[in-house]
Amino acid sequence: MTRIKRGYIARKRRTKIRLFVSSFRGAHSRLTRTITQQKMKALVSAHRDRDRKKRDFRGLWISRINAVIRGNPKVSYIYSNLIHSLYTRQLLLNRKIVAQIAILKENCLFMIANNIIKT
């Protein structure tokens, strides 16, 4: 078989991969075989963690809401009852917005909870 000299095409492909992994440590940014492996691993991790980030933030919002509601003796609510009553009253407040209200303006959250209790 004759030898195929790839010339600039292979070099172009490798330099493109090198630019992607240039910030990696050690051989992961220098050796061609490990560069391709680390690029694939990085892209897989990025894809996986985009979904994981959504899960983590939802859990964070839930724990923030629950901590603020349970911490106040004025309101006898727990998280699940609050969310259930929000849905039954058809209030369009998602967990992210309720968590921001809980952190920034606790009084508003307690006003919302008290109005839900009264009705």
UniProtKB/Swiss-Prot annotation:
InterPro entries: Ribosomal_bL20, RIBOSOMAL_L20_CS, Ribosomal_protein_bL20_C. Belongs to the bacterial ribosomal protein bL20 family. It comes from the Eukaryota. One of its GO terms (biological process) is translation. It comes from Phaseolus vulgaris (Kidney bean). This is Large ribosomal subunit protein bL20c. Pfam families: Ribosomal_L20. Keywords: Chloroplast, Plastid, Ribonucleoprotein, Ribosomal protein, RNA-binding, rRNA-binding. Its main location: plastid. Disulfide bonds: none annotated. Binds directly to 23S ribosomal RNA and is necessary for the in vitro assembly process of the 50S ribosomal subunit. It is not involved in the protein synthesizing functions of that subunit. It is found in: Plastid, Chloroplast. One of its GO terms (cellular component) is ribosome. GO terms for molecular function: rRNA binding; structural constituent of ribosome.
